[in-house]
Structures are given as C-alpha cells and as structure tokens.
C-alpha cells in the first residue's frame, strides 16, 4: 500500500511543456503586469507522502485510547521507510540474480527472511501471506 499524501499538490493548470509553448513576441522596453507591480507568484506547498495515517489506524485498532506524539510518528515513519527500502533493495538483487525483471511475492518473502531475524521473520511472512491471500480473494 503506498503512503498517503499529507498535503495536496497544486495542479499545473494545463500549462504546456517549456519546449512546446508558442513563441511569444516581447517588446524590449515593456514589462509584464505581474513584474511591473512587484507581485511574486506564491509557491504551492510541496506534497509529503507519509505512512502516518496507516500507523494511526493500526494504533487505534490495537490501543483505542492511546495517542501518539508527532515526534514518535516521525520516528515510526522513518522506520517504515527504512524497512521498505531494505526489503525492496534485497528483492531487486534477488530478481537480478535469477535474471528476472519482475519482483514477485516470492522475492519479497525471501528478502524478508534474509533481513529480519528469526521469529520476527516468521511472523512477517505469515502476515504477508495472509494479506496477499485476502487481496487475491477480494480481487476476484
């Protein structure tokens, strides 16, 4: 499941790419209306994708009366991103070793077994298998 966006990104509003725009003729002595009045364009807020909403939902399932600080949420988000990157990198290497261009659930499962220690790997594999089975049955 991809991370959910924390903020909305402003749309580009139908602007053509820089190379495709029609040539505009300007007179040397004139400025545009915005430049003449000294107004600057406001930049839209950049979109930040996090796992915060998903972490919060899991927290409420496990401990409905417990909250979480922004700093703790940030740490957990970094943790999830780190584990995701490690698993994806290892799965990519496994696919390359086997001369495959697609990462399947098998590569993910093997990379989880290689990265996580002992009992934690077993639980992760069983939860992952359960999630894939649930997804496969609902997709039909």
UniProtKB/Swiss-Prot annotation:
Post-translational modification: Monoubiquitinated by the ubc2-bre1 complex to form H2BK123ub1. H2BK123ub1 gives a specific tag for epigenetic transcriptional activation and is also prerequisite for H3K4me and H3K79me formation. H2BK123ub1 also modulates the formation of double-strand breaks during meiosis and is a prerequisite for DNA-damage checkpoint activation. Acetylated by gcn5 to form H2BK11ac and H2BK16ac. H2BK16ac can also be formed by esa1. Acetylation of N-terminal lysines and particularly formation of H2BK11acK16ac has a positive effect on transcription.
Compositional bias segments (type: Basic and acidic residues): 1-10
Molecular-function annotations in GO: DNA binding; protein heterodimerization activity; structural constituent of chromatin
Source organism, top-level taxon: Eukaryota
Cross-link (Glycyl lysine isopeptide (Lys-Gly) (interchain with G-Cter in ubiquitin)): 134
Residue ranges, annotated region (Disordered): 1-48
Keywords, ordered alphabetically: Acetylation, Chromosome, DNA-binding, Isopeptide bond, Nucleosome core, Nucleus, Ubl conjugation
Gene Ontology cellular component annotations, sorted alphabetically: nucleosome; nucleus
Assembly: The nucleosome is a histone octamer containing two molecules each of H2A, H2B, H3 and H4 assembled in one H3-H4 heterotetramer and two H2A-H2B heterodimers. The octamer wraps approximately 147 bp of DNA.
Family: Belongs to the histone H2B family.
UniProt protein name: Histone H2B
UniProt source species: Aspergillus clavatus (strain ATCC 1007 / CBS 513.65 / DSM 816 / NCTC 3887 / NRRL 1 / QM 1276 / 107)
Classification lineage: Eukaryota, Fungi, Dikarya, Ascomycota, Pezizomycotina
Gene it is expressed from: htb1
